[in-house]
Amino acid sequence: MHQPVMLEETIAMLKPHAKGRYLDGTVGLGGHSFAILQSAGDGAELCGLDQDKKALAIAEMTLKPFKKRVHLVHTKYSSFPLILKALGWKLLDGALIDIGVSSLQLDNAERGFSFLYDGPLDMRMDQDANNNSLFEIVNKSRQEYLKDIISRYGEEPQANRIAKAIVQKRRTKPITTTKELADLIEQAYPAAWRAKSRHHPATKTFQAFRIVVNSELNELEKFLNMIMGWIAPGGRVAVISFHSLEDRIVKQYMKSWTRSCICPPYVPVCKCFHKPEAILITKKPIRPSEKEISENIRSRSAKLRVAEKVLL
């Protein structure tokens, strides 16, 4: 069963209220959205977006008690301006994205997200989308490209060995399943590395492939580049990330929102008169409690960062 990560902490940070309008860009099964509306009380509205149609169908049932105040749309979260304009919304009182993979996706072998189950090489969040599945990337990409994405997005030290093993294997026949790919990656790992690793050797490579299949970092940057322009003064943006690449991007954007001067470093006295858009609510990211991690091991790497829009 999917458990929303850092639910209490997220609601405490967003401070929903009865007259507010909220965006949940990754509504998933509706857990965070339900808590936002329940905490806000009567009158609050929520727009929930998700790429996964199956997740949206469950979210619709979860959020049924708030039906008239919920607007669910099947789309990427970076498309939120189009959706908000269609709703006639001009400003938001809060926005949330939780950029992890849900249990609905991880635990369904047919989706191809996990090396723990044997399924097809898919990994697409939106199964109706035209983007390449993992099958195309694994079986058609050049070795140098595979090495680059495994190294860059998985931060995998054995990227070269893994890319070489993939190319050698597919010369005889296409790689078709997650188990086949995971076993191949494990065999490519040096025995000494396998012995000392705390995680399955395929963990970082599967992360890298998922990021590429779904253009996850590009999607995140698009969202962060636009969202602060849609937040009302006093409204907050909350982002839950699960690995260092995502968190680094979130941290950089939130830092840029709080910057009071954007003059080049060689200018001795500020002449830009730039005003910060936001203040940081979380100087350091909020992490899950030990209790939550013990109840939901998948939350262990989560980080919550929050910024609040200021009156310009």
UniProtKB/Swiss-Prot annotation:
Reactions it catalyzes: cytidine(1402) in 16S rRNA + S-adenosyl-L-methionine = N(4)-methylcytidine(1402) in 16S rRNA + S-adenosyl-L-homocysteine + H(+)
Gene Ontology MF terms: rRNA (cytosine-N4-)-methyltransferase activity
GO biological process: rRNA base methylation
InterPro entries linked to this entry: RsmH, SAM-dep_MeTrfase_MraW_recog, SAM-dependent_MTases_sf
UniProt EC number: 2.1.1.199
Principal subcellular localisation of the protein: cytoplasm
Function per UniProt: Specifically methylates the N4 position of cytidine in position 1402 (C1402) of 16S rRNA.
PANTHER family for the chain: 12S RRNA N4-METHYLCYTIDINE METHYLTRANSFERASE, S-ADENOSYL-METHYLTRANSFERASE MRAW
Record protein name field: Ribosomal RNA small subunit methyltransferase H
Gene from which the chain derives: rsmH
